[in-house]
């Protein structure tokens, strides 16, 4: 797909960079999925891994399908309620395995009904997840974190002030969505066109998903499995600040919707706002967007653009944005800056945002202005942060 369009020399360089990224990622691996008592966490295992774990205790392959159904379609956490499995096997499973969830250490609900979860994992580390309900329809998006902390240090983002602690494992990523569904009682998984209250996943929480690609991909493959949660890839959006070498792979292997945190149209400014730009500048990022295989008129790439007063909000910026994305099936989400303690930026004025949006729309691109949600509980875009710290950090 996208990779096949690249010249060999570029492909070799990109592949080498992918290897480097994955090797660096391994330094921040999540803790083992086996508990101190020897039991194995089943959430987060692929179908093949689940079958292998059951085979190791003497069970046949069809048992994996049964357990998968109970975990991901029915949403159970107790083997004793798996009515299609005989009691002796239920007890055997309970002796060897566990079906866990992250602990909801704190749950806050905004005046606009946005709900923020502070999830605590087995090693005590924490990440935040946000459910954003649609106020017109019975549906909503779950904003999921991929890392504890973040390594990117984007200047306008609260998460960027928190050092990267570690990656989240597939179980912890899937677990956020499952625990949110527990909170709203959305089990068993709706089928077909049946409306879903938690209808979409946006990988826009804490962390850079493409710096934890293996775990994110594994989690999303589980979520998309038709015999479990069965969420369509069209209902999943992966947001990246521009880890260019991993974008081709994500497009080829997952094919989910892509959102790009752009925020500036000149390299000198983006170098400051999104330091990752120094490694993968705007021209490389836009080229990767053009290669992204899911991009079509029906599945547009979303460019996220935070509106910062006097920084990136001029008509010249808007015209340059239009020039950059010309020919890409795209929409531009304009995000009024959401303040957080210690931030140095202000949001652009309403008229300034409207003027910017009109320039983009006049060029033929949808340019909605995102309505801030959950600001009063620091759950809006760019406001997520926990107190988790890397080992050795000051307390």
Task: Label each PLM-derived region with a short phrase.
Residues 109-110, 145-146, 239, 261:
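Short linear Ser/Thr-Pro motifs
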Residues 1-127, 131-133, 188-189, 290-298, ...:
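Auxiliary Fe-S-binding modules of radical SAM enzymes
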Residues 47, 151, 243-245, 266-267, ...:
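Alpha-helix N-cap/helix-start and coil->helix boundary motif
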Residues 182-368:
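Conserved AdoMet/S-adenosylmethionine-binding subsite of the radical SAM
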Residues 115, 127, 140-144, 152, ...:
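Generic beta-strand structural signal
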Residues 134-186:
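Canonical Radical SAM [4Fe-4S] cluster-binding loop centered on the CxxxCxxC motif
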